[in-house]
Amino acid sequence: MSDFIDLITPSQDAVVARLKAGVSPALGSVHQHVKQDTQPPFVMVGSIDAANEGSKGSQAENITVELHFVTRGPSRAPLMALMHAARACLEGAALEADGVVFETPNYLGATVSNAGADGVTYAGISTFEFIAEPA
């Protein structure tokens, strides 16, 4: 039996790298962690869940990643454009990280909010899943 490795961190890093390479900065910035007072528009990695998909003695994990989006403006159009750009660069794309093999991400769905209390802030969540295993 081989040693088990951390698959969550390289999964997060691979998603962030793919988003940074594929989402135009004009649509929004990409973050693993959003610092306080970061102004929209942006996308950040939210919750990450890992479920065992390996057989006895082997490691494979079904990784589910939420992406959180925040925009500000007179309509939801910029939010939906940012969410679409993220989907376009992740769904079916090759993820890469040293020591890890990924299946291509599958898009599971999304939620888009109404305007926040200020009337101009919009938020959304998109969810993707993929299998990760040691190389």
What is the meaning of each model-derived region?
Residues D37-F42, E53-N62, D118-T121, A135:
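Short, polar/acidic, helix-capping and beta-turn segments at strand->helix junctions
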Residues M1-S55, A88, A93-V101:
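Small/polar-rich, solvent-exposed N-terminal microdomains that initiate assembly or binding
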Residues R72-G92:
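Mid-chain, well-packed structural core segment of small domains
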Residues R18, P25-A26, A88-A135:
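Acidic-leaning, charged glycine-interspersed low-complexity segments
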Residues Q59-G73, Y122-A132:
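Oligomerization/assembly interface segments of phage tail-like spikes and tubes
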Residues D6, P10, G54-S58, G73, ...:
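Residues at secondary-structure transition points
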